[in-house]
Amino acid sequence: VEWSTFLLLLISAYILFTCAKNVRQVRLRIIYYALSGFSFVIGMEEMSWGQMIFNWKTPSQLALINDQGETNLHNIRLISDHSDLVYGLILALIILVTLAANRLTKRIKDKNFYTPLLNLAPSKMLLIYFIPASLFSLCLYFNIHEYTHGFIFRGEEELMEMVGAFGLLGYSTSMISRLKNMQQN
């Protein structure tokens, strides 16, 4: 599952980078570059920046504070304790933007704001990935899992991350498709 998530994130990063290179609006270009960079960093974190591929030893100082003794930031205790909450809230924000984009653009008269919002808003079809991943993540953070309520299974963190990565891949492919359609018209 981790390898799949890693590959999905790197493919998404590449596609979003391609979007950034092809879009004309500077604001959208910056956003696509940021999304690409974010996807790349999260993908590399998933593989502990290559440690899982090249099998190097974790630096001793990092191993002391890393819950899994790996070369990554997301397993450092302070971050690890809140990563499910952060992931769940990021996905909840994506869900909110997806559901509210059309309503927001009708209320806001500033074309400089609503045009990029409409261009960047995910398709509602992608909610099939984002909603379960967000719910699983928040259930983990608030300790609603197999040991207390019996409906989430072992290894759910990795599965939740992969479902979110599938959603990101769907988003990135829809963005590149949207850009190509806009360029043809």
In which residue ranges do the predicted regions lie?
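Juxtamembrane "helix-exit" motif on the non-cytosolic side of transmembrane helices
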Residues: 104-106, 138-151
